[in-house]
């Protein structure tokens, strides 16, 4: 594994342990040249997924890109990073288990919104504003109404 600090390929694993309920191996590494320490994660990749963009372009699925978009929606929210990581892993597992070689970007966005809705309303709204391409304040009002209706529906289940 190449050192992210000096680019040397001579690194050693100092600690290795399971993470995310055994679905991931977390490794602490140290560079033998510069002494830099860093963490890597090893995951099973069932298949290479292609993302079909709205423009018709295809690109390889990038877990880091998914993580960055979710992190952006979660910015300055008090959410446990492990919970976010589990959500991302869950989305990736769902995508891989679909058995489709190509997945529309809209499907990925839908799965992210579904996941964020269970975690944090504000992050859900932030992500939705980009995913649904909000143009004005009424778009925000509509999604807040949608969330409020969902909460009211859930509360009415307990009133019965």
From Swiss-Prot:
Free-text remark on how the cofactor is bound: Binds 1 zinc ion.
UniProt key word Metal-binding: yes
Cofactor: Zn(2+)
Keyword Transit peptide in record: no
Gene Ontology molecular function, alphabetical: ATP binding; DNA binding; zinc ion binding
Keyword field: ATP-binding, DNA-binding, Metal-binding, Nucleotide-binding, Repressor, Transcription, Transcription regulation, Zinc, Zinc-finger
Classification via Pfam families: ATP-cone, Zn_ribbon_NrdR
PROSITE patterns, per the entry: ATP_CONE
Domain (ATP-cone) ranges: 49-139
Gene Ontology BP, a term: negative regulation of DNA-templated transcription
Zinc finger (unnamed): 3-34
Family: Belongs to the NrdR family.
Role played: Negatively regulates transcription of bacterial ribonucleotide reductase nrd genes and operons by binding to NrdR-boxes.
Entries under HAMAP family matching the protein: NrdR
Name assigned to this protein: Transcriptional repressor NrdR
Organism: Bartonella bacilliformis (strain ATCC 35685 / KC583 / Herrer 020/F12,63)
């Amino acid at each position: 594994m190449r050192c992210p600090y000096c680019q040397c390929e001579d690194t050693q694993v100092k600690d290795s342990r399971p993470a995310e309920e055994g679905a991931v191996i977390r490794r602490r590494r140290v560079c033998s040249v510069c002494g830099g320490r860093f963490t890597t994660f090893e995951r099973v990749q069932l298949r290479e997924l292609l993302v079909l963009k709205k423009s018709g372009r295809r690109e390889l699925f990038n877990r880091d890109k998914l993580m960055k978009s979710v992190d952006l929606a979660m910015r300055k929210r008090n959410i446990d990073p492990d919970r976010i990581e589990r959500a991302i892993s869950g989305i990736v597992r769902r995508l891989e288990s679909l058995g489709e070689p190509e997945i529309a970007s809209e499907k990925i966005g839908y799965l992210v919104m579904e996941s964020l809705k269970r975690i944090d309303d504000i992050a859900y709204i932030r992500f939705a504003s980009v995913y649904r391409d909000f143009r004005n304040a009424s778009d925000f009002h509509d999604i807040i109404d949608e969330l409020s209706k969902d909460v009211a529906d859930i509360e009415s289940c307990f009133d019965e």
